Amino acid sequence: EGEAITRLGPRHYNDTVNGRTTYPVVADPSDILLNQAWVRFKPAQQVETIVGRQAVNFDNQRWVDSANWRQNDQTLDAVRVAIKPVAGVSLDYGYAWRVNRALGPRSPQGIWRENDIHLLRGSANTKPIGTITAYGYFFNIPDAPLSSSKTVGLRLVGEQKMSGNAKLLYAAEYANQRDFGTNPRTYSLDYLAFEPGVSVGVVTTKIGWEKLEGNGAVALQTPLGALHAFNGWADKFVNTPAAGLRDLYVDVSIKLPAVAGIKGASTRLKWHDFNASRGSINYGREWDAMLAVPIIRGLTASLIYAEYRAESFGSDFFTSLRFSNNFIVPITPAEKMTFFAWTVWVCLKREVESRNVISYRASDF
C-alpha cells in the first residue's frame, strides 16, 4: 500500500518540517511513502502470522493505534501472530523493531529505529458479562527514551439489552505503567477509565471518566496510542502534563435521517472538563462537534469543530473542516504491479536519502 501526500493551496501552515514555525501546526508534510508491505501466512483457520510493515490496532486504540485519521498512518515494521484457539478467545503477540510515525520520515522524530517492542494481548468473550482483555505492552525506544515503558492492564467492555430498542453500555479499564529499557526516569503510574452509556435507537449517550496519573515530574504516556481520539479533538493533551490528567466527559452520537436522498449522515457532540490528577489544578474545558455526510461512495465530508477554553493549561483553540475518503478504483493486474514497483523505488530512494548513506540495507526496511 503506497500513499502520496501533497498540498493543494498556499503553504500558510507549519507541517513540522517546512520551517514555518510562526504558522499553526498541520502535521501532514508532503511525501511519497510505502505505507504497508507485508506477507500473511495462515496455515490454519485459528492461526495467522503477518510479517512486514503493517497497521496495528488493538481494542479502542488507547495504547496501540495506526493514527489513521491523519494523512499518513502510523505503521510498525513487525512480526505479529494471532491465535484463536476456541470461539470467543483470541491471543496476540507482536514484535516490532521500527515505528513509522504519522510525522513522516523527513521529521527528526518521524521514524523510531532499532526498537525492542513487545505487544501481548489476550481477550475472551465472557457472555453475558462482556469481553475481558488482558494486555502487556513493552516499549524500548532508544530514539525516544522517555517513551520507553511497560504497561500491563485489564479492560472490560460489554452491553446489556434493556426494554424496547434500548441498550446499556459499559467499559472499564485499569493499567499500571512503569519505566522500561532506555528510559532514564523511575516511576510507577496508574491508568483508570470508566465509560457507562445508553443507546436508544439512533442516539447513543456516554458519560466517561479517565485518569492518566502524573507525579509532578513525570506522567503516564501513550506514545503508540490514538492521541487524537482521546481527551479532546483540539489535541491539547497528546502529551500528558507532568501533574497528570483527569478527563470527565459527555459523548452524544446521533445517526441522522436521510435528507434529500443522502443517507448515513451522523453527528457527534462532546464536552470535556480537564483537571490534573495531582492537586486541584483545573486545566480547562472543551466542546467538540462533528457532522459527517457521505457525498458519494467512498467519499465523506466531515465538519469538525473543537473549542478549548483554557484555565491553567494551554491556550484557546479552534479548528475546522476536513474531508475523508476511501476510494476503491478498479485497475488491472499489470497496473497494480507497475504502481507497486514505482512506489517501492520511490520509497527506497527516500529511505536512503533519510539515512544519508549511499546504499540501502534491506534488513532495516
Per-region residue spans from a language model:
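C-terminal functional modules
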Residues: G244, A276-Y283, M290-E311, S320-I331
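Surface-exposed loop and membrane-interface regions of Gram-negative outer-membrane beta-barrel proteins
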Residues: E1-W38, P43-Q45, V56-R70, G104-R106, ...
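Signature for the C-terminal beta-barrel architecture of outer-membrane proteins
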Residues: Q45-T49, A67-A217, L248-V250, K255, ...
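Cationic, low-complexity basic patches in intrinsically disordered or flexible, solvent-exposed regions
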Residues: R350, S354
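Outer-membrane beta-barrel "beta-signal"
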Residues: V250, S315-L348, I358-R361, F365
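Flexible internal linker/loop segments at domain or repeat junctions
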Residues: A219-G244
